[in-house]
């Protein structure tokens, strides 16, 4: 009966998600906002159609292997040739930038919600990740200048695993209840190193096994090979203290840039593989946001409306511009203009990875997880409704569209 219940709930989640797609298109609203609202309506607080308690087998799979697949997909779209000219700025945004954003948000969250610095930092770390899944179709529609578009998308893809690592490290400190010397810093560094090594090994293995060379013995089974390898990498990383999310992302980068390693795939097999990854990612995105809506505490959201909106103002108007300025201005090779910096400061949407991390924290009953989930919900709604809808207008005003000249 338990298996039947899981299958029923998963089927209903997908049904709710699929119904939301045409509604979002009809209303010209961001899909993820509609998915959250649909989840709320389907949840116990409104219709009672869905009840998906966090911590079950189904939600654990979505928030672990599902997110690893999303990060693999993000890495798959990164072109090392394209981002080489802005590599310094990207690395600064991805590592110290994530930490700086988390720290600034934490300073605001502490007095507003009356929580400890550790819990406030946990909230900031989860919010620090952005979402390439939202930005890619948005920029394709706008025709944004390639340098800006590719940098913002690459930053979003790279800082997702970094935000996840920082979040899980801080969550460990919060759960332990104390800061044990350099332990968290050591764990953070070890997670990164192990994650990179595992990711490189897994990416090379996947690229070779699916190649057009004699070694491509699994080229006709890309879906099963991908799932098996991602699962193996995820649980291996968890077992030895590495970042499974970073490993999945790095593996995606390796496969996406296989031509630099002189590894070729047949066009047919490559299209099948990329199509499978994209479709699987779509399913996970639908599930994550509907599950968030189902488990959303509307009372908690309304009770924290004012401090939540103040936190979002600090997040958008202070933390992001300060981080972008400190990380990109020193990047001489990038030759960033003021208008480009303004656009990059404004354009950052909160999406699936922060939502999934918040869900994982709730599942593990980490102290402060409800606050984190509430703030992530605010961030999703505010950034998608405010920033995503005004990005085109701002890009046009700043002269950052292809063929446009910057206004004087």
Regions found by a protein language model. Name each.
Residues 1-408:
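Transmembrane helical cores of multi-pass secondary ion antiporters/exchangers
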